[in-house]
């Protein structure tokens, strides 16, 4: 139950440093070069532009089910190279015990690029 352990206490100022935004998935490709089965995903964040990410979510989501889905992502982490692919944002989700991820999304249509707070 390692996932259930609470992490160290963070301050409100720590939280304010993280820029979490609403985006819409506009492209999903198989990421064959990745070590674990993954997708390459392009996300439209409105005025922030289109950003790329990778996600190990193929067991719970088919590519066609992800297109046009709104998601929530951290947009101000430094880019990370994954098997030669530049991942620019971190898509947020709920971590299940088996390691699968359930994507977080607004419960209503939200303007692209709007902040989560």
PLM features: residue spans?
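Phosphate-backbone binding interfaces of nucleic-acid-interacting proteins
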Residues: 2-117
């Amino acid at each position: 139950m390692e996932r259930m352990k609470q992490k160290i206490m963070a301050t409100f100022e720590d939280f304010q440093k993280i820029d979490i935004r609403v985006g819409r998935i506009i492209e999903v490709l198989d990421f064959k070069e990745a070590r674990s089965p993954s997708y390459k995903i392009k996300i439209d964040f409105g005025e922030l532009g289109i950003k790329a990410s990778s996600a190990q979510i193929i067991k719970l989501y088919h590519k066609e089910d992800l297109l046009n889905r709104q998601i929530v992502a951290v947009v101000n982490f430094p880019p990370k190279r994954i098997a030669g692919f530049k991942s620019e944002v971190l898509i947020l989700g709920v971590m299940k015990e088996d390691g699968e991820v359930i994507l977080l999304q607004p419960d209503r249509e939200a303007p692209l690029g709007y902040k989560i707070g």
